[in-house]
A protein has these predicted regions:
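Beta1/beta-strand and adjacent pyrophosphate-binding region of the FAD-binding site
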Residues: 1-12
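Short hydrophobic core segments
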Residues: 5-7, 181-193, 322
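Active-site substrate-recognition segment that forms the wall
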Residues: 14-23, 44, 49, 80-82, ...
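Glycine-rich FAD pyrophosphate-binding loop
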Residues: 21-40
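Dinucleotide-binding Rossmann-like beta1-alpha1 core, especially the glycine-rich loop
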Residues: 44-123
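Helix-loop-beta segment of a Rossmann-like dinucleotide-binding subdomain
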Residues: 51, 55, 79-89, 115-148, ...
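Conserved beta-strand-loop-beta-strand element in the redox core of flavoprotein oxidoreductases
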Residues: 164-181, 186
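C-terminal catalytic lobe of FAD-dependent flavoproteins
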Residues: 279-362
Length: 362
């Protein structure tokens, strides 16, 4: 019997897989790649919410676990995909500068916000009010990470490339059977695909579509990330990733004319040089209304667990949440209250009246 059957091979799925493997547990992943958000993610990690000058939930702990996780995976796969790089916030007024300095005085933000103005001028970026520097930042090349991790899984017969059908779950006394696979636990790490999961679709996952560009701008001489209303991330060879939009209504992955226009307008607010769009792509982020993840065990079926709702911060959240869920399952350590799906217990009770599956017992 397997220890863990993991549904989904995005950031959440591989984060849990890696934690399980590190603890000598047997795993198998199932994924048909119907969800794209991890693969097209910007990949930035940043401990500060720059719009509101507030600390990301549990940022210090997440950064430690994240760096340990990516160091280990880079070592294992012999590939570099975690790039530590400063993020500069471009200021548009003296007032924005003042807000920055006020925020950097706060005890929880002090480790993350530099108190020195960055006055350096970058070719093709107009910056009369200079920049503030966020510390402990960078980006993960998520597409490369997922591609190489998938190769590793396939080489070790740890990945089934097929759609998962929850109708085929049968419940055993000490786990589940799925088709010809027996496992102690299932981890659902499906991203926005959770809406089709009859065991957890009562949870308020509200996908937010994001669109991004890769642009070519030979005259933009930038070796760090600039963040304003969008981020500009250097990829080498005069290529830059730019994003992202937020659309709460469109739940498709397809790039749109509306998203394209919004990105074009925002880029032109920041850079003054010519550029061409090399690629335009989109994905639906798994976001939750209260901006907290979805982590926990099903109220009735104790072999079913969820790891979802990583939203816009998957590269930072994934490793820490995977560890928290693993510790909960194996060592009965309580899940942080803010992330535990028990906060939606009333929604679960309401769902019992409608469509929660009864489950088959073998």
């Amino acid at each position: 019997m397997l220890d863990y059957l993991i549904v989904g091979s995005g950031l959440a799925g591989i984060s849990f897989a890696e934690v399980a493997i590190k603890n000598n547990k047997s795993i198998l992943l199932i994924d048909n790649k119907s969800q794209h958000s991890s693969r097209v993610a910007g990949g930035l990690y940043n401990p500060v919410i720059l719009k509101r000058f507030s600390e990301v939930w549990n940022a210090k702990e997440q950064l430690v676990l994240m760096n340990d996780f990516y160091d280990r995976v880079e070592d294992k796969l012999q590939v570099k995909f975690n790039f530590k790089m400063p993020i500069l916030r471009k200021f548009f007024s003296i007032e924005e500068q003042n807000n920055w300095f006020a925020a950097s005085d706060k005890i929880n933000l002090e480790p993350f916000l530099s108190t020195k103005l960055i006055t350096k001028k970058y070719t093709s970026i107009d910056s009369p009010y200079d920049y503030g520097e966020v510390l402990h930042t960078g980006y993960v090349n998520t597409a490369l990470l997922l591609e190489k991790y998938e190769q590793y899984l396939l080489e070790n017969n740890l990945l089934l490339e097929e759609a998962f059908d929850s109708k085929d779950i049968e419940f055993l006394d000490s786990g589940i059977q799925y088709k010809n696979i027996q496992a102690r636990h299932i981890i659902f790490a499906e991203g926005f695909g959770m809406h089709k999961n009859p065991f957890f679709n009562y949870l308020p996952l509200d996908g937010t579509k994001g669109e991004l560009f890769i642009i070519k701008a030979p005259d933009l001489n930038l070796d760090l990330i600039v963040n304003t209303s969008v981020f500009i991330l250097p990829m080498g060879d005069s290529l830059f990733k730019v994003g992202a939009t937020y659309n709460w209504h469109d739940k498709t992955d397809a790039p749109t004319e509306e998203g394209k226009q919004e990105l074009l307008d925002r880029i032109k607010e920041i850079i003054t040089c010519d550029f061409e769009i090399v690629k335009h792509f989109g994905g639906v982020r798994p976001t939750v209304a209260d901006r907290r993840p979805l982590l926990g065990t099903h109220e009735v079926y104790k072999s079913l667990h969820i790891l979802n709702g990583l939203g816009t911060r998957g590269v930072m959240l994934g490793p820490a949440l995977a560890q928290a869920l693993y510790d909960h399952i194996e060592n009965q350590i309580p899940i942080p209250q803010e992330a535990d799906i028990k906060r939606f217990h009333k929604r679960y009770l309401k769902s019992l009246i409608s469509d929660q599956p009864s489950g088959r017992k073998k």
